From Swiss-Prot:
This is Ribosome-recycling factor. It comes from Sinorhizobium fredii (strain NBRC 101917 / NGR234). The gene is frr. GO terms for biological process: cytoplasmic translational termination. It comes from the Bacteria. Residues 135-162 are annotated as: Disordered.
Length: 186
């Protein structure tokens, strides 16, 4: 196993933490409608819980409106119930086989609460990145101890791992700042 491959693996795992963070913050509701808002909603369907996007089509016809087209008309009630019980503060309006969901304006308190959730997601991602860094550093120490690489090579690799970690954490901070600005925008 060469050290270059190990660095690529560490980078892949760190990029995975960024991707997970992007997914987490995409589901946070901002002032604009986004189909991702309904990602956490699961519906009791056909004897099991299913993600909403597996029983309906979600569209954004207007900036403050979501439209959910349920594929099976017998599921409309279950989808309505799931959205109401999801703690997202949304109240669908049933219109035949479709549900229209007006998105209310976010008040200051709700905005601050969403920013706090975004910070929690960011911290969770940073912890994951630091775990990857620790795994990389432990691997380098072991390789040095086993005599696979020299002390100079180990130090150089450690610096590269630290630089990679710093870059990934600053990317998470940048994404967080963007999302925070988007949430607080009235």
């Amino acid at each position: 196993m060469s050290e270059g491959v190990e660095l690529k693996e560490l980078k892949r795992r760190m990029d995975g933490a960024i991707a997970a963070f992007k997914h987490d913050i995409a589901s946070l509701r901002t002032g604009r409608a986004s189909a991702n808002v309904l990602d956490p909603v699961t519906v009791e369907a056909y004897g099991s819980r299913m993600p909403l996007n597996q029983v309906a089509n979600i569209m954004v016809p207007e900036p403050r409106m979501l439209s959910v087209s349920v594929w099976d008309k017998t599921m409309v009630g279950a989808v309505d119930r799931a959205i109401r019980e999801s703690n997202l503060g949304l109240n669908p309006i049933i219109d035949g086989q479709n549900l229209r969901i007006p998105l209310p304006e976010l008040n200051e308190e709700r905005r601050k609460s969403l920013v706090k959730v975004a910070h929690d997601y960011a911290e969770k991602s940073k912890v994951a990145v630091r775990h990857v860094r620790r795994d990389g550093m432990d691997g380098l120490k072991k390789a040095e101890k086993d005599g696979d690489i020299g002390q100079d090579e180990s130090r150089a690799q450690s610096e590269r791992v630290q630089k990679m970690t710093d870059e990934v954490i600053s990317e998470i901070d940048r994404l967080l700042a963007e999302k925070e600005k988007e949430i607080m925008q009235v």
